[in-house]
UniProtKB/Swiss-Prot annotation:
Keywords: Cytoplasm, One-carbon metabolism, Pyridoxal phosphate, Transferase. It catalyses: (6R)-5,10-methylene-5,6,7,8-tetrahydrofolate + glycine + H2O = (6S)-5,6,7,8-tetrahydrofolate + L-serine. Its main location: cytoplasm. This is Probable serine hydroxymethyltransferase, cytosolic. One of its GO terms (cellular component) is mitochondrion. Homotetramer. It comes from Schizosaccharomyces pombe (strain 972 / ATCC 24843). The modification N6-(pyridoxal phosphate)lysine is found at K243. Pathway: One-carbon metabolism; tetrahydrofolate interconversion. The keyword Cytoplasm applies.
């Protein structure tokens, strides 16, 4: 074997054992952890096979039938198939909807939509981050523009009602009449209730705005029909592909075709979104698409049509409801008083800890969550909650009784965290002091025992991996 052949043909474990060892440790971590991050999931072996394939080798700037490189016969076939399966996964008529499957990730996809629809400094409204929105919907504070979206465009937030935790549609409508946005974004990252898309459509129409729905978190639930679909009301729908959808890491943009509305004289006005959005994706913001990802996405979208997939998504919602009930039994306050989707947002302040402390203690017992703002928070940088999602562990086989056990473990860990916080002196009780005292948890028998129980339990459920 030549030296070049040795480089090209030697398996990873032999050629680069350092990287292979890190990957093995990550596989072990995933296998032995209860993963509750709502934006994470475990994709299938078939999807991973497609990701690590020859489709990664090909360059293909452009779109099917209009490439800037030769040799794209089969790349065209896979991208076209992916588009067809994307429309089928959401029961969409190709005469009324198109889709771009080249987007690299969710936040860039949103930016591509904004740029396609309006010029720099155009106006958009999105749900405020502390209310459960997403950075890419134009988040900014009183003193700083955080998301680049708020730099390139003029953004104004709408918020939840502080008393109910639900989107305040009346205030949104009032503010929209004053702000006159070109785009109204209906989408969330930590809002657990259903969005009233019909009301959003009515508000958008009242100011002649486009309704852009970001269903990144819930697209799997929408595809399976376990929650209402936004497509009846939206002009554009964006989604990531790796959260509840359970595909590879990527994104899609769906756009309307055909008649949009009639003007005051009764003349038809047609959508012109397709060319604008496609141009915004390529060449506006991207070069060559990631063909291995598009291939893997095609595989995942076929899985969306399987009865087992629909059963899985129904179980995701059932498991989230169990989490709601169990947290309430233990006296926790939940944002919006519960969930209709795949996650609950738990306010842990009443336990005497904040989101960051809760996240760290839970990680030490192999329960992986993320700190998150709750509507009552004054700052997105000091969150009082944790976000608990059910898609990942439902993929591995968790049912209702398993999530009862999950909530019990969380409650025990947070009780420990609160007691540890109380032991800190008043002049040294900040997060860094808490983490310093906590260390890796090895000096606390209670944490060691919890970690052992969780790791053994989680490891008993299957995980699709190559290790």
């Amino acid at each position: 074997m030549s030296s070049n052949d040795s480089i090209m043909l030697t398996p990873l474990k032999e050629q680069d054992p350092t990287v292979a060892e890190i990957m093995r440790h990550e596989a072990d971590r995933q296998r032995s952890s209860v993963v509750l991050i709502a934006s994470e999931n475990f994709t299938s072996r078939a999807v991973m096979d497609a990701l690590g394939s020859v489709m990664s080798n090909k360059y293909s700037e452009g779109y099917p039938g209009a490439r800037y490189y030769g040799g794209n016969k089969f790349i065209d076939q896979i991208e076209t198939l992916c588009q067809e399966r994307a429309l089928a996964a959401f029961n969409l008529d190709p005469a009324k909807w198109g889709v771009n499957v080249q987007c690299l990730s969710g936040s860039p996809a949103n930016m591509q939509v904004y740029q396609a629809i309006m010029p720099p400094h155009g106006r958009l409204m999105g749900l405020d981050l502390p209310s459960g929105g997403h950075l890419s919907h134009g988040y900014q504070t009183d003193t700083k523009k955080i998301s680049a979206v708020s730099t390139y465009f003029e953004s104004m937030p709408y918020r939840v009602d502080p008393n109910t935790g639900l989107i305040d549609y009346d205030m949104l409508e009032h503010d929209a009449q004053l702000f006159r946005p070109k785009i109204l974004v209906a989408g969330t990252s930590a809002y657990c209730r259903l969005i009233d898309y019909a009301r959003m459509r009515q508000i958008a129409d009242s100011v002649n705005a486009y309704l852009v729905v970001d269903m990144a978190h819930i697209s799997g639930l929408v595809s399976a029909g376990v929650i209402p679909s936004p497509f009846e009301y939206a002009d554009v729908v964006t989604t990531t592909t790796h959260k509840s959808l359970r595909g590879p890491r990527g994104a899609m943009i769906f756009f309307r075709r055909g008649l949009r509305k009639h003007d005051k004289k009764g003349n038809p006005i047609y959508y012109d979104l397709e060319d604008k959005i496609n141009f915004s994706v390529f060449p506006g913001h991207q070069g060559g698409p990631h063909n291995h990802t598009i291939t893997a996405l095609a595989v995942a979208l076929k899985q969306c049509q399987e009865p087992a997939y629909k059963e899985y998504q129904a179980q995701v919602v059932k498991n989230a409801k169990v989490c709601e009930e169990e947290f309430k039994k233990r006296g926790y306050k939940l944002a919006a008083d519960g969930t209709d989707s795949h996650m609950v947002l738990v306010d842990v302040k009443s336990k005497g800890v904040d989101g960051a402390r809760a996240e760290r203690v839970l990680e030490l017992i192999n329960i992986v969550t993320n700190k998150n703002t709750v509507p009552s928070d004054k700052s997105a940088f000091s969150p009082s909650g944790i976000r608990v999602g059910t898609p990942a562990m439902t993929t591995r086989g968790f049912k209702e009784q398993d999530f009862v056990r999950v909530v019990d473990y969380i409650d025990r860990a947070l009780t420990f965290a609160a007691n540890l916080q109380k032991e800190l002196p008043k002049d040294a009780n900040k997060l860094k002091d808490f983490k310093a005292k906590l260390g890796e948890g090895e000096q606390y028998p209670e944490l060691v025992q919890l970690q052992k129980e969780v790791a053994e339990w989680a490891s008993s459920f299957p995980l699709a991996d190559k290790w």
